[in-house]
């Protein structure tokens, strides 16, 4: 890694012939600190090279049959559980509202997280998917970017645990728009949809390391000497020198100042910002209630 070579040279240390796989304690420490620095920078700011758009689709619900017994959480005699998943929400005769699959026991049996209220054989039921995978390299979602592109409105979230219990337990909690939360590393929606919808959101990726020949992040840590990263060289070098001196319990006051300045400069210059007026004037609205005539429909 050129980063380790450059920092070693500036600190008056011996420059290693290779970094990945080295058994030299100093080289191992510099690599470990560089890995930590990169991960810290990912969490520190929404760097434009780490912002990604994710577009995905919900899945069609699975309609099937099974045997249920009052007071039991087990459903038997399901023709096939192949397309079912833990967390799927069930609807049908005798089912508790928002009950979901707790375990898939066999090719014909599942266990729910709530008992049914009636006994029926070969009763119809529907399983809808509420948990969806987050994209590879996902670190965190960017606020207010989650949209339903099918119905053309913003999804509501993220919801807290308190909000979620209200949605599932409140008397009136259902609305026309989807609610969501990040739950157990999944994207969970309410209510679980039974047909295909197109959803989208933007997120910050934790893939800050670029593989050889690539200018985009494809992994979350250095794994080869030819790897580079999405962050500017001056920022990485200033940060690694500061991290190294701090780890060695040496004076790092000057290096901390250099790193702080580099971080501030690069944040400010990462994306363009609009000019700010000292005397802003609101723009006129071209379309409003005054654009609609009082009567005489249809207009000619």
Question: What kind of region is each of these model predictions?
Answer:
Residues 1-73, 82-103, 107-300:
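Glycine-enriched, solvent-exposed interface loops adjoining structured elements
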């Amino acid at each position: 890694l050129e980063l380790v070579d450059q920092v070693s040279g500036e600190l008056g240390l011996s420059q290693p012939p290779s970094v990945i796989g080295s058994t030299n304690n100093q080289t191992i420490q510099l690599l470990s600190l560089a890995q930590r620095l990169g991960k810290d920078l990912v969490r520190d700011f929404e760097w434009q090279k780490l912002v990604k758009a994710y577009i995905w689709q919900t899945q069609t619900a699975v309609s099937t049959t099974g045997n249920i017994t009052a007071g039991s959480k087990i459903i038997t005699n399901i023709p096939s559980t192949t397309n079912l998943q833990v967390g799927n929400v069930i609807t049908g005769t005798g089912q508790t509202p928002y009950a979901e699959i707790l375990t898939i026991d066999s090719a014909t049996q599942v266990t729910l997280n709530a008992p049914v209220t009636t006994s029926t054989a070969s009763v119809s039921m529907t399983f809808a998917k509420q948990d969806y995978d987050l994209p590879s390299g996902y670190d965190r979602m960017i606020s207010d970017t989650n949209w339903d592109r099918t119905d053309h409105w913003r999804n509501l979230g993220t919801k807290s645990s308190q909000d979620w219990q209200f949605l599932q337990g409140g008397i009136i909690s259902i609305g026309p728009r989807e609610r969501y939360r990040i739950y157990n590393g999944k994207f969970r929606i309410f209510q679980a949809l039974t047909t295909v919808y197109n959803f989208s959101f933007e997120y910050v990726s934790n893939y800050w390391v670029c593989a050889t020949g690539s200018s985009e992040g494809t992994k979350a840590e250095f794994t080869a000497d030819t790897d580079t990263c999405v962050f500017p060289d001056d920022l990485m070098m200033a940060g690694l020198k500061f991290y190294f001196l701090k780890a060695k319990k040496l004076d790092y006051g000057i290096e901390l100042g250099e790193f702080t300045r580099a971080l501030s400069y690069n944040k400010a210059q990462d994306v363009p910002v609009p000019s700010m007026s000292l005397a802003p004037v609101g723009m006129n609205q071209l379309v409003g209630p005054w654009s609609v005539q009082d009567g005489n429909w249809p207009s000619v």
